[in-house]
Structures are given as C-alpha cells and as structure tokens.
Amino acid sequence: MHGLLLAGLLALPMNVLAYPAEQHASNVLSRRGVDIESFRLPLKAKYMDSEATAQKIQAMSFSKDDDYVSTATKLVKSTFPKSTFRVVDDHYIGTNGIGHVHFKQTAHGLDIDNSDFNVNIGRDGKVFSFGNSFFTGEIPKENPMVKRAFSDPVKALKGAVKALNLPVKSDNAKPKTIAGKESFEFMGTTGALSAPKANLVYLQKEDGTLALTWKVETDVGDNWLLTYVDAHNSETVHNVVDYVASAEYKVFAWGLNDPTEGNPTSIRDPWTDASPYTWNSDGMSKYPTTRGNNAIAQDNPTGGSTYINNYRPQSPNLIFSYPWSPTATPPSSYKDFSITQLFYTTNRYHDLLYSFGFNEAAGNFQVNNGNKGGKGNDFAIVNAQDGSGTNNANFATPPDGSPGRMRMYNWTTARPNRDGCLEAGIVIHEYTHGLSNRLCGGPANSACLNALESGGMGEGWGDFYATAIRLKPRDTKNTNYSMGAWAANNPKGIRAYLYSTNLQTNPYMYTSVNSLREVHQIGTVWASMLYDLMWALIEAHGGTYSANPVFRNGVPQDGRHLSMKLVMDGMALQPCNPNFVQARDAILDADRALTNSANKCTIWKAFAKRGLGYGAKYDARNRTGSNKLPPGC
C-alpha cells in the first residue's frame, strides 16, 4: 500500500571511519597569505522573475513551433539586438519541467567571460524568467587578433603564480595549443594537480570597461583557480575565481538545541562525505542560495503549497551570514537567518543519518542519488515561518521518489513571538518522521506508522533523536531534558514529563499506554524507554559528544551514537505498523546483526526498567508489563 504520512510535533487542538569536525570560519578567507576575496568583482547580474516576465513577454512574438533553445535565443536577440553571443552547450530541462538555456556574450570572437544571459523556459514553451549580466558599454573597435598585440600566455601564467603565491613551478613552462580560440595547456610545470591552462578572453571591469585578459586555470588542490591576468601587463590581476568554494553559515551550531544554549557562529563547509556535491549543489547545478541535493529551504508566509519561487537568501559567494537578536520582532525581520538555520539543521541531520545507513537505497531525501540505488528527485522541502499554522510543525512523507515537506511555524507563546526553526530539536523531530516512514515497511510504503501505537512510536523516535543529539559533555544519566521548551516558552516543554532516567521524575511505564489515546502521549512513553536505552549504552561503551560518530567495522564506538544506530536499524527490521514489543525485538535484532548481540542484556535491562521486559505482552486494551530479563541475562 502506498501512502503519504503527515506527522506533527503536537496534537492538533576493525576499520575506523571518522568524519571531520566542522570548521569555524574566520572573518577573512586567506589562503597562502593572499586574500582572494580582494580580487572579486562586484555583482552585475539582473533578474526578471516570472511575474514580471509574464508582463514583458506579452509584447514579444515567439513561434509556437520553436523549441525551448530557439525561444531563448530569440529573447536574447530581442533584448540585445546589437550584441554578439553564443549558446553555451549545457542547456537542459529540469525535473520541474523548466528548460534552462545559457548564453555567453562575445566580442571579436572572444568570450566576455563574465557576461552571461540565462533564460528559463516554462512547460508551455514560453519564457518563464531570465537574467543577464551582459556588457552594455562600448566594445573596443580594434580586433586584437589582427595585430596580436598581447602578451605571451607563459608570462600570464607566471604573473598568476607570483600574484597569488601559488605552489607552481613555471620556469620551464611551454604552451601547447588545445581546442578553443587562443587556448593553451602548459607543459613542463610542477606543483599543480593537472597541467595549467590559459585562454584569451575579455573581462568586464568594475569601472565599466572591457579588459583583454588571459584566463589562467590552475588546480592546486585546496584551490582551483581562474586568474584573469591583463594581456598587456602580466603583473596586473583583474579577477580571481575559485572553483573550490567554501560555504559559510552563521547559525546555532550542531548540538545547540536553541538560543538558550549558545550564540550563532560562522561555520565553514560543514558537510561530510554523505553530501559529495556539498550542500549547495545537486551534482548538476550549483545554487547560490539555500538549495542543494538534500534540501531546499525558503520562507512561506502565506502557507501556500508552492515553494520553488518562494523567497530564499542569495549569496553568490556562499556566505550565509545574517543578523539575529532574541529581541527582534516580528520573526519575518530575521527570515534570512531563520531560513539559513533551517537549511543547516536539515542538511546536518541528513549527513548524520547517512552515516548510520539512511542512504540512497534506504530511501533518503536527495535529488541526485548518484547511481547508488533508490529513487531520486526527492529532496526535503523545508519551509521556514510557514503561515499555515502556529505553535506546531509537521512533516509530510510520501514514498521514495517524491519530496518530503517540512513546515516550521512561528510560536505565539512568547513576546516577541519565537521561530520554531531556531529550536533544532523541533526540526530534528520532524525530519525523523521522514526517516521512520521511509524505513518502516520500506521506502515505497509511507503508510506503516498509521496505527495509534505505531504512530505513537513515530512521535517517540522524533523526540529521542532530538534529545540524543543535544547531549552535552557535562551530562550524566541524571540529566533531564524537555522537548520544545524554548519555542513553547515553558521550561517543562510540550510533553507530559521530562525525559529522565529517574522514575519519580518520569513515571511512564509500558502499561501506561493502556490509558493513553493520543500519539504524542504514547510517543513520550516510547522515547522515555529509548532515553533509558541510550544511557545504558553510554554506561557500557562510554560517551562521545563529537558531532560525528567514529565507526569500527560499521559499529559506532560510543554509546550515544550506537543507540541511534540500533534504533534506526530496528526501524527497517520491524513490520509495518509495529507495536512496542515488536519494535523492542527489532532493536535486539539490530544489535544481533551489528554486534552479534554484544549488547543484548544491556538492551533488555533498559526496556525491562519500564515494563517492556521479558514476558511483556501486547493487547490493545490491556498490555501486560514485565520487569524480567530473559535467561542468560
């Protein structure tokens, strides 16, 4: 049975694998003692959105028989009738049905390298939107190819090496002609990962004129650079582009649950190997905004169902740094920060779950699965400050191949109102609905947690992962945690009890479910058991509070991450719409598969503490509890 599950936070009234730590960014990017940022040219692009385009295009005539490339070409010609340009050979129709065509402006047969025009064609064959950075000044009258009054490309290479202090030896460099007008590859160099290249191009300068330059390409590992060296003076560098772009996000870092636990910091390149295209690319396109292979984040103040044209912060240099203050009001005044935080938390959780096995074949949320199994084209659509509700959040999980959708609401429980995106636990809780629904019953079936008890466990898994991730080095098994306390402006949170290993603080037992009739109440019982399980495994294996787990032979080497791994593996093992007993058994089976039951008795003791021990029985109206352990424990 196929289905879609919408889950909310509240009821409606010996190989060792280690992942790198996140890098906290400095204020100025400086590599090899050179500030590359100082060479960047200002932005020149203009963009006409779909609404404005619809009005403008009414006055233009296009043939219905044109293909999308021809239609786009006619638009460029009509917009710049006196300009010369070429079609870039990378046009395609995206998964949303929009055709994308790119053009490069030329002068005297040479590219103006930073003069581009992009046209987006809708499903109806009409221009959807477009943007351009075409040069509108005076083109030099003299063709440089006639007198060839420009410097040797070797001098340009040496100029780039000197200006940027590159580790490239170019004394013996010799140019070899390659495909393309005035294009060369340099032989006899050392220090670069591949042979440096150069080709002659024009470049728009900041003062509105064109400069004839050598575009020198050097791949030195940490940087893959395009250096625009003046073709008449090799000591002058006009612009530098680095293919190895570091993305930076100013956010509450991973592990900080909400603003009471710390301050926003700038974090650079936080992705792991789980995101080989980084967070701002899907392997096919790079996005200078909060969009990538794993997620697309935007605001949604109207609460509508569309998202692709909603607002997102834009940053061509991938520096997503925006102000936030606890006294700022309304939340829309800091929407850039909110969207960035939501994008960060969602991607960070994607990468962690990937390390535990929620990958392409398991039905995770990605556009491009890279031929690794599963169905792609299903990133998570995550809406910040969604206007369709307040004081809650939800996640819709269709089967694998269709995007999940998270809606994060503002909370009116405090003055000023609070944004749920800033409480990581709520985001993690919601995304976990996607995890559990894709794993339980298989990625193609999203209807395997729709019974009262199984749906309750769906809520409990969300609380468990949210709590496990926020643990701090100072915490012990006596540490208690709430759920949703900051957003709800209530230190007790939004659950009946705190998550605690103390039965006086949290008295929930397995038989408590007999009197509960709401999924979040039942979920609190399940999450309480998993919280006990986590601390039992931490006592057995030690705890680590690093952002990423360390594995040996596929087994997390600390109790906290081991508990997350076993619980997740259990989701994939259990039947469709399981009960507590079956889910407990699935976790035991997960440990058997992963560690050959090395933690069997530890797991049994944790569940037995709250009455889900050996001999506990399920009955919808009269569950039987047990504190017993099986033989051998």
From Swiss-Prot:
Question: Listed GO cellular component terms?
Answer: extracellular region
Q: Which UniProt keywords apply?
A: Glycoprotein, Hydrolase, Metal-binding, Metalloprotease, Protease, Secreted, Signal, Virulence, Zinc, Zymogen
State whether keyword NADP applies: no
Q: Which Gene3D superfamilies match?
A: 3.10.170.10, Neutral Protease Domain 2
Chief place where the protein resides: secreted
Signal peptide residues on this chain, from the entry's feature table: 1-18
Which residues are reported to be glycosylated?
A: N410, N480, N622
- Which InterPro entries does the UniProt record give? FTP_domain (IPR011096), Fungal_virulence_M36 (IPR050371), Peptidase_M36 (IPR001842), Peptidase_M4/M1_CTD_sf (IPR027268)
Lineage, top-rank taxon, reads Eukaryota
Q: Where is the protein situated, by its record's location annotation?
A: Secreted
* Residues holding Zn(2+): H429, H433
The cofactor(s) it depends on are: Zn(2+)
The enzyme's E.C. designation: 3.4.24.-
Broadest EC class?
hydrolase
Q: What function is annotated for this protein?
A: Secreted metalloproteinase probably acting as a virulence factor.
Family, per entry: Belongs to the peptidase M36 family.
Q: What is the protein name given in its UniProt record?
A: Extracellular metalloproteinase 3
Native organism: Trichophyton rubrum (Athlete's foot fungus)
The gene that this protein is the product of is MEP3
